């Protein structure tokens, strides 16, 4: 039976480290503040933002919400992004996605100062990651790496397969795995013989956004399996992209859903906010 990689406990370690770092900066008079841009009233987005702001309060990070109606003009959001870029009191900020239908996210993300891009989702941040320049890393991919590293899972020289090629998770995670000297294959909806490819993986990360798509037939005996997916089941519970019970019988280690990658994503947003504050102190 697979060992469960407990994202909650590892995230708690990171939160404690962030809280200590925030206290240290505050003692030196350095502000640590996260601003959030929210357009519209999508229930999931409102909940996510509320959770993130509560996380900030728990580690001593000040947070401010900039909320707009769904019909907010694009130019008004762009003006706010430019203002936050130039505000020395703001350590970092992010735009809660998805945005309402009338708003194009790309110009807004492109306008974010990379040193304040705590989500790590702007084209500039993606480019810096791709060429190996220092940058704030996307929260979910970085959370996966930290969870593996802090759980004692070595990556150097191992064969890693990522299922999913999104800009949010799959692509940046593949780059981070390469940084760890893993040998990386990326699978997607056009991959032929998906199970044949994934069975080669010593470390298998599933981030396809399809409930229960990976089962025992996709998993090598003794592999480490990371389930990034999260879906609301008919009974109200949460499930992932991996059929957990059958995969647990073959894998050496497995992230649960919930309690695996999700807590790590939230913790890495706090980590990035602290890093952004440190960077601003160095530049001052």
From Swiss-Prot:
Q: Which GO terms describe its biological process?
A: L-histidine biosynthetic process; methionine biosynthetic process; purine nucleotide biosynthetic process; tetrahydrofolate interconversion
Entry binding sites for NADP(+): 164-166, 189, 230
Q: Which organism is it from?
A: Rubrobacter xylanophilus (strain DSM 9941 / JCM 11954 / NBRC 16129 / PRD-1)
MF terms (GO), sorted A to Z: methenyltetrahydrofolate cyclohydrolase activity; methylenetetrahydrofolate dehydrogenase (NADP+) activity
Q: How does it assemble?
A: Homodimer.
The entry sums up its family as follows:
Belongs to the tetrahydrofolate dehydrogenase/cyclohydrolase family.
- What Gene3D superfamilies does this protein map onto? Leucine Dehydrogenase, chain A, domain 1 (3.40.50.10860), NAD(P)-binding Rossmann-like Domain (3.40.50.720)
What cystine pairs are annotated? Answer: none
- EC identifiers of the protein: 1.5.1.5, 3.5.4.9
Function of the protein:
Catalyzes the oxidation of 5,10-methylenetetrahydrofolate to 5,10-methenyltetrahydrofolate and then the hydrolysis of 5,10-methenyltetrahydrofolate to 10-formyltetrahydrofolate.
On the tree of life, the source organism's domain of life is: Bacteria
Q: List the catalytic activities from the record.
A: (6R)-5,10-methylene-5,6,7,8-tetrahydrofolate + NADP(+) = (6R)-5,10-methenyltetrahydrofolate + NADPH; (6R)-5,10-methenyltetrahydrofolate + H2O = (6R)-10-formyltetrahydrofolate + H(+)
CC per GO annotation: cytosol
Alphabetic keyword roster: Amino-acid biosynthesis, Histidine biosynthesis, Hydrolase, Methionine biosynthesis, Multifunctional enzyme, NADP, One-carbon metabolism, Oxidoreductase, Purine biosynthesis
Pathway given in the UniProt record: One-carbon metabolism; tetrahydrofolate interconversion
Q: In this record, what's one Pfam family? A: THF_DHG_CYH
Task: Output this protein's name.
Answer: Bifunctional protein FolD 1
């Amino acid at each position: 039976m697979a060992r469960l990689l407990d994202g909650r406990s590892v995230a708690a370690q990171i939160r404690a480290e962030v809280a200590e770092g925030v206290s240290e900066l505050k003692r030196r008079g350095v502000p640590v503040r996260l601003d959030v841009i929210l357009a519209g009233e999508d229930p999931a987005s409102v909940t996510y933002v509320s959770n993130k702001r509560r996380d900030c309060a728990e580690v001593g990070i000040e947070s401010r919400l900039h909320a707009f109606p769904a019909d907010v003009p694009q130019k008004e959001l762009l003006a706010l992004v430019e203002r936050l870029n130039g505000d020395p009191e703001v350590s970092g900020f992010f735009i809660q996605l998805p945005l309402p239908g009338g708003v194009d996210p790309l110009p807004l993300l492109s306008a974010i100062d990379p040193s304040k891009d705590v989500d790590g989702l702007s084209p500039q941040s993606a480019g810096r990651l791709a060429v190996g320049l220092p940058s704030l890393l996307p929260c979910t991919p970085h959370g996966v790496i930290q969870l593996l590293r802090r759980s004692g899972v070595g990556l150097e020289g191992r064969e890693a397969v990522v299922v999913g090629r999104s800009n949010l998770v799959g692509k940046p995670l593949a780059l981070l795995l390469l940084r760890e000297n893993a040998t990386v294959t990326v699978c997607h909806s056009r991959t032929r013989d998906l199970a044949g490819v994934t069975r080669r993986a010593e470390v298998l990360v599933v981030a396809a956004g399809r409930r229960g798509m990976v089962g025992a037939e996709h998993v090598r005996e003794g592999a480490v399996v990371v389930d990034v997916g999260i879906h609301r089941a008919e009974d109200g519970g949460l499930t992932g992209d991996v059929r957990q019970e059958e995969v647990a019988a073959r894998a050496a280690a497995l992230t649960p859903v919930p309690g695996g990658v999700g807590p790590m994503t939230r913790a890495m947003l706090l980590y990035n906010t602290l890093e952004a504050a440190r960077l601003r102190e160095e530049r001052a």
